[in-house]
Amino acid sequence: MCDFTEDQTAEFKEAFQLFDRTGDGKILYSQCGDVMRALGQNPTNAEVLKVLGNPKSDEMNVKVLDFEHFLPMLQTVAKNKDQGTYEDYVEGLRVFDKEGNGTVMGAEIRHVLVTLGEKMTEEEVEMLVAGHEDSNGCINYEELLRMVLNG
């Protein structure tokens, strides 16, 4: 199981309490996915239903759970988080390959990394792409991905 630190658990509990509308330390089943997403996870609705034990749709706004029952569900979702494959990342970057030659503009990849998804700082991006740009300012994204994914 993916164990959380004491600080993480405290942060998760604080976020959980923000969704507790009645102040009884519980949230509705229907809020479970929202809380997980607020905590940086991205479970599908099917994954949320699975960790909740596949409740009927009419139970979603009736059944409640407390933090002690929510935390193991969050751990399950975090542990099963799809990290994506090399091919997934290549496909994602191929969208930016306007010439179809396996390269993307360095400026464009920088922009994507600092503005979309799990945003990186400009310093992190510079460290990542350092030495990968050719004389035209292009980056071979397959080569970059191999370097990133292989450490």
Curated annotation (Swiss-Prot):
SMART domains linked to this entry: EFh (SM00054)
Modified residues (N-acetylcysteine): 2
Biological process (GO), any one: muscle contraction
Superkingdom of source: Eukaryota
Keyword hit for 4Fe-4S: no
GO molecular function: calcium ion binding; cytoskeletal motor activity; microfilament motor activity; structural constituent of muscle
GO CC list: brush border; myosin complex; unconventional myosin complex
S-S bonds: none
Modified residues (Phosphoserine): 57
Gene3D superfamilies assigned to the protein according to its UniProt record, in alphabetical order: EF-hand
Keyword list, A-Z: Acetylation, Motor protein, Muscle protein, Myosin, Phosphoprotein, Repeat
Record-annotated EF-hand domain positions: 7-42, 84-119, 119-151
Binding partners and assembly: Myosin is a hexamer of 2 heavy chains and 4 light chains. Interacts with SPATA6.
Function: Regulatory light chain of myosin. Does not bind calcium.
Protein's UniProt name: Myosin light polypeptide 6
